[in-house]
Amino acid sequence: MKGLLHFLLAKIILLALASSFVYCYEPSPLQDYCVATNETNGVYVNGKFCKDPKCVTANDFYTSGLNVPGNTSTGPGVKITVVDVKRMPGLNTLGVDIARIDFAPGGLYPPHTHPRGSEIFLVMKGKLFVGFVSSNEYNYTLFTKVLYPGDVFVFPKGLIQFHANIGKTNAVVIAATGSQNPGRIIIGNAVFGSKPLIDPKVLAKAFALDFNKVKYFQAVFS
């Protein structure tokens, strides 16, 4: 009987810990809203100080500009216009953000991950080739799709994904993530452009590359 009680107690503790781990990455709000402010005399929640609720206005939950095309003339031909907590303070603690992504013809959003949020795409214009790769649990399976206006595609949190404009015109996507700060890790930049750089010998062995090739990639990405 004593052993059974110990077993049940251990099980309850493990379940409680598991529940806390599930919610620790994006805490549930304990109030209706916590509008972010730069003032430091308020309550500190989710990395931001909360504005006095009596001073909150509708403008704290509003922004505009996603109708304006982004400049895609530099880099890989992609411009991301993000509405995050910096641009809309009322997003703080709400667990979402939204962005407009503009692609020039041939534009590419390189392989990357969002470590803190899943992402959903709504194609507004153009023709996009998108995909993501599963983890080792599912043998690094590649899932791809060609998307057209009105199509929706979702990318699971933390998995490597990419988006390419394969049409002859500009493409526009409205993207939302399940985090006010989903983070972004561009794979090439992280591996070959870290600060400080990863030892080239490590990367040469990991990717079965010539040492000089690794040095070249590091020069490109750093």
Swiss-Prot record:
SMART domains recorded: Cupin_1 (SM00835)
Nucleus found in the keyword field: no
One matching Pfam family: Cupin_1
Protein family: Belongs to the germin family.
Cellular component, GO, one term: apoplast
Binding site for Mn(2+): 112, 114, 119, 163
Glycosylated residues (UniProt): 38, 71, 139
Keywords from the UniProt entry: Apoplast, Disulfide bond, Glycoprotein, Manganese, Metal-binding, Secreted, Signal
Protein name: Germin-like protein subfamily 1 member 5
Subunit-level organization: Oligomer (believed to be a pentamer but probably hexamer).
Signal peptide interval: 1-24
Principal location: secreted
Stretches assigned to the Cupin type-1 domain: 64-215
Cellular compartment(s): Secreted, Extracellular space, Apoplast
SUPFAM superfamilies in alphabetical order: RmlC-like cupins
Gene3D superfamilies xref list: Jelly Rolls
Sample GO molecular function, one term: manganese ion binding
Cystine crosslinks: 34-50
Function: May play a role in plant defense. Probably has no oxalate oxidase activity even if the active site is conserved.
